[in-house]
């Protein structure tokens, strides 16, 4: 049994959870999310608490699935009540970003501007032309979109130029040592 899944998921005020047709639906002030349930888990809703239990007939994989669905439901509850945000910073001469409608336009030191379509459930804003904020209620979509932005120009280890997550540590390498001796 998963240790985390032994604890109930406490629902904040304004968040409702329901189960319909083998799907869990979480509604809150920021929106609603759905997740298909696996047959290995049973969800119990008691008042303002949600419990995740292994199905009684399952002998194989109960702990893994129980922990997975506890985390998925917990993230859904947090997403519809508070939301998720990832912030990226662009470091480099001439690096800048802008949002034009549903397109994120990046100038990242290549010969052409890089244009990334923004998914419907994600909000993107740019501060000071170099800080990109990705917000949404679905943790997976927010993280995936932020990772796609970062993948366009990963931080390089010599000068640290590129797109990185805010407060991300980039391991730096020393450059070539200059020749100092004569033959």
UniProtKB/Swiss-Prot annotation:
Membrane keyword on record = no
Please list the GO terms describing molecular function.
Answer: rRNA binding; structural constituent of ribosome
PROSITE patterns, alphabetized: RIBOSOMAL_L6_1 (PS00525)
GO CC, one annotated term: cytosolic large ribosomal subunit
Instruction: List the SUPFAM superfamilies.
Output: Ribosomal protein L6
> Single Gene Ontology BP term?
cytoplasmic translation
Signal peptide residues are none
Q: Which UniProt keywords apply?
A: Ribonucleoprotein, Ribosomal protein, RNA-binding, rRNA-binding
Query: One short Pfam family name for this protein?
Result: Ribosomal_L6
Extract the NCBIfam families matched here. L6_bact (TIGR03654)
Which family does the record assign?
Answer: Belongs to the universal ribosomal protein uL6 family.
Q: Which PANTHER family match?
A: 60S/50S RIBOSOMAL PROTEIN L6/L9 (PTHR11655), LARGE RIBOSOMAL SUBUNIT PROTEIN UL6M (PTHR11655:SF14)
Sum up the protein's function in the record's words: This protein binds to the 23S rRNA, and is important in its secondary structure. It is located near the subunit interface in the base of the L7/L12 stalk, and near the tRNA binding site of the peptidyltransferase center.
Q: Oligomeric state and partners?
A: Part of the 50S ribosomal subunit.
This protein's name: Large ribosomal subunit protein uL6
**Lineage of the native species?**
Bacteria, Pseudomonadati, Chlamydiota, Chlamydiia, Chlamydiales
